[in-house]
Amino acid sequence: MSTIEWQSKAEVVYESILQGQILPLSNGGNSYDIQAALALSTCYRLTPSKEAILKINESFINYFIQSKLNNPSAEIIIREPYPIACGSYDSTKKYVGIVHHLDPVIENKSWKHRWYFNTLRKNLKKLDTTITVSEYWKDELIKIGANNVNVIYNSFDVSKYADDEIKNDFKEKHQIAIDKKLIYIGNASKEKGVYEVYEALKDQDYELIMSGPVNNAPNIPVKYVNLNKSEYIKMLKACDLTISMSKMIEGWNRIAHESLLCNTPVIGNGTGGMKELLKKGNQIIEHDYNQLPLAIEKVLDNRSYYTSEGYKFVRRFDLTYFNESWINLINQLK
């Protein structure tokens, strides 16, 4: 049986793998990575690397030095971006990289960020294979020289999103008007475009809601909720529509994906890999905030079509697909 070491700078990934479950503090990218590690641990001896964790207040230089000194004994090393950029490479081992997306805004923050992204791009060429989450990023990674790039899509336990009659229950619990259409505008942060969406819809007769572990958009009068996973799914089911106008170049878009699993249609701007999700799911792509009211009206007037088309596309990405894709990848690598 092959041995695998999973390298992530995020402590929540390390702890989740040890505990065999996705812990609540995991973000979307973390959740994908943990899910992949847990899938592989059913067939291989997989251990998470404590040495790869970026400690609180640890300098990047110290992290870089410690990463270079780390020489794991595992036959296969799976690396997230920080370990890809900072780790050493041994010709006797196989290396797999995971890249969800690259963010040019972060890259231009400082010389350290520019150095990191340049080194990451250079080291992508040293990997035996690179995994990403959309055709958009597969093309982008190939352009910068990554080897053997494969797409394994975000996937979910589809049974957890099975429809039930809880729409009014959620609204009553969170004191939301039952007689108004409820629209989810995404994570409460400016990077997700919530300010612009609010401005475009503030004069419309809709109830808006946003979520996340922290309200990073507290100065707009939009209802904010911090929900556990089961309540989050109930919220998506209670919504009549999800809007995703992200300013980031998305890897995919798990919010949009989960909305479609909940039979909630999506309007989005289709940045990065989100375009593939919305286009193949026959959802509306809209770049102009001022056109959102018309787009919303179109979707709500034909909601059954958009819910059916969206669910038909995303339901194929279940855990059977995901687990088999990762296990087959490693089998081919050996």
What spans do the regions from the language model cover?
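Conserved donor-binding/catalytic core segment of Leloir-type glycosyltransferases
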Residues: 176-192, 198-203, 209
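Conserved acidic donor-binding segment of nucleotide-sugar-dependent glycosyltransferases
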Residues: 280-290, 297-303
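Short hydrophobic beta-strand element within catalytic cores of glycosyltransferases
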Residues: 265-268
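Nucleotide-sugar-dependent
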Residues: 244-254, 270, 275-276
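Carbohydrate-associated surface elements
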Residues: 136, 155
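Acidic anion/phosphate-binding donor-loop and adjacent secondary structure
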Residues: 156-173
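Membrane-proximal helix-turn-helix segments that form the acceptor-binding/catalytic region
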Residues: 110-130
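A charged, aromatic-enriched C-terminal amphipathic alpha-helix characteristic of glycosyltransferases
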Residues: 28-31, 301-333
